[in-house]
Amino acid sequence: MAANKDKAGAAGAGDSMPASASAPSQDALAVPIYWAEAKRELMQRDRIMNKLIPQFGDLHLRGQPDPFTTLARSIVGQQVTPKAADLAWGKLLAVCPKLAPNQVIKLGAVQLSGCGLSKRKTEYILDLADHFKARRVHADLWSEMDDEAVIAELVRIRGITRWTAEMFLIFNLLRPNVLPLDDPGLIQGISQNYFSGEPVSRSDAREVAANWEPWRTVATWYLWRSLDPIAPPA
């Protein structure tokens, strides 16, 4: 699923932010403040990155500014093709253009299911909306919390896996040092670029990624790009 990440992925850009949520501290659509430094350091210390990064010029990670929408979009995209996820997401936005927790709860299970969502995904999105509405998540504090603390809070929500939480760290909070080891695109990118296409274990991936710290998000993004150079991953 990593190979279509900025394109449709973690969220739909441009949706308004619910009152219970907060945006990243910087403009999510601007160049992340650490990007230039990260590129420079990665190119200095990693021969693969030194060849890979220049191929993509000024392209960079584009964040998704609305926490609720980011997470809802990730749930919609779980275990389906990008095309099916885009279709269901489009139907959801058609019936709920201002995607916010209160509006989703008002829609209810029947209308959500009518957008092509499975019973389980419908339950997950309603539970997510309820968490935001009841303020059982601390979206206004996430920008100040460390990565593992944010992950620990998010995975308590039904339908949010560690991978989903890591995508949230990358695309909403723009954290610079996330290594999503459960992401097939990352593993495939390491395999193709560092191991000539040979199978790669998690321990292999960790060993390669140790050289990227504290910029593992940036290196991961460039490996996604190496697999899908036209559309940014989401």
Locations of regions flagged by a protein language model:
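C-terminal accessory module of base-excision DNA glycosylases/AP lyases that mediates lesion recognition
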Residues: 1-59, 123, 143, 147-148, ...
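Alpha-helical ds-nucleic-acid-binding substructure associated with the helix-hairpin-helix region
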Residues: 29, 48, 52, 80-81, ...
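Short, contiguous, helix-prone interaction/anchoring segments in small proteins
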Residues: 66-70
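Amphipathic alpha-helical segments that form the core helices of the histone-fold
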Residues: 71-73, 112, 209
